[in-house]
């Protein structure tokens, strides 16, 4: 399944979206006056966001933030933000825009504005090769988990409860690093992935998450 990712916005007018109003105009004015655009970016999710050998933020989402700031003639400021904190960072004013692989959902749209999609991912389930999991259905009755606050984790948690198997369980992890550690211990997790292949040492099962 492909899931389209969007920018989560507090400055819809800046991106040419149809939403308009005093609040958006004021926000854009504040950004231009400050001379910087603060982008909430997740930096443990390569190639979308990570750090290079010099500890500088790099990745597609980082580039997108830089391009957006350039279009506004301001300086880009990367605000490192874990997946669970993306929307809180925007709502609280710690960031002006989320550029962090955020799926557009109705629930999120009730709280924040969304841009048009800018990227599409393939949904996969990451497992250890020795788990014997070959399909999404094989996850029933297994310990599963995902990174808290992500669309994939929310969908898998919902399915895990719907399966009603007492042997199964779901756990949310606070970072991609914690999720990767769980995979190494035999927990299966959903993730947005760039085709064609998952990370070395993992097997890929189909998923509708």
Question: What are these model-derived regions, one by one?
Answer:
Residues 26-101:
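Extracytoplasmic small-molecule ligand-binding "clamshell" domains
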Residues 53, 65-74, 152-172, 202-206:
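Ligand-binding cleft/hinge of the Venus flytrap
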Residues 85, 102-110, 154-162, 182-209:
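A ligand-binding cleft/hinge motif common to bilobed small-molecule-binding domains
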Residues 127-144:
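Flexible hinge/capping segments at coil-to-helix
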